[in-house]
């Protein structure tokens, strides 16, 4: 696929989407949503030998994250990030 970009069926590209929970009329709040690259493959034997807990499958992924944002304060002094630009980058939060 050109430049590693592709769309999976039923999974939209990584882009800004309005967060309806935090948005107010005339003051929209945006967050990055959508899909990026991921793949899974058998773990190479040489890598398995160095693992504390050997795993048969290795996975790689990038996540849809904010490339740029502004910090805003909502009522009750709640601070959130209003995303202004998105890209596919390192996933910071993983399920165990």
Swiss-Prot record:
Name of the protein described by the UniProt record? Glycoprotein hormones alpha chain
All disulfide bonds of the chain are 11-35, 14-64, 32-86, 36-88, 63-91
Superkingdom field: Eukaryota
Where is the major localization of this protein? secreted
Q: Which UniProt keywords apply?
A: Disulfide bond, Glycoprotein, Hormone, Secreted
- According to its UniProt record, where is this protein located? Secreted
Ranges in coiled-coil conformation: none
**What SUPFAM superfamilies does this protein map onto?**
Cystine-knot cytokines
Gene behind the chain: CGA
Which PANTHER family does the entry mention? Answer: GLYCOPROTEIN HORMONE ALPHA CHAIN, GLYCOPROTEIN HORMONES ALPHA CHAIN
Family matches, as Pfam families:
Hormone_6
Subunit text: Heterodimer. Glycoprotein hormones are heterodimers composed of a common alpha chain described here and a unique beta chain which confers their biological specificity to the different hormones.
User: Which family is this protein grouped under?
Assistant: Belongs to the glycoprotein hormones subunit alpha family.
Keyword Transport belongs to the record:
no
User: Main role?
Assistant: Shared alpha chain of heterodimeric glycoprotein hormones. These hormones bind specific receptors on target cells that in turn activate downstream signaling pathways.
Biological process (GO) annotations?
Answer: G protein-coupled receptor signaling pathway; positive regulation of steroid biosynthetic process; regulation of signaling receptor activity; thyroid hormone generation
Q: Which residues have a glycan attached per UniProt?
A: 56, 82
Does Disulfide bond count among this protein's keywords? yes
List the InterPro entries hit by this protein, alphabetically: Cystine-knot_cytokine, Glyco_hormone
Sorted alphabetically, the Gene Ontology cellular component annotations on this record are: extracellular space; follicle-stimulating hormone complex
Molecular-function annotations in GO: follicle-stimulating hormone activity
Which species is the source of this protein?
Struthio camelus (Common ostrich)
């Amino acid at each position: 696929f050109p430049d590693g970009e592709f769309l999976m069926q039923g999974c939209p590209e990584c882009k800004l989407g309005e967060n309806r929970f935090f948005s107010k009329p005339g003051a929209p709040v945006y967050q990055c949503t959508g899909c990026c690259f991921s793949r899974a493959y058998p773990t190479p034997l040489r890598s398995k030998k160095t693992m504390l807990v050997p795993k048969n499958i290795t996975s790689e992924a990038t996540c849809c994250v904010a490339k740029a944002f502004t910090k805003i304060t909502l009522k009750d002094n709640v601070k959130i990030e209003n995303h202004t630009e998105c890209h596919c980058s390192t996933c910071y939060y993983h399920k165990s």
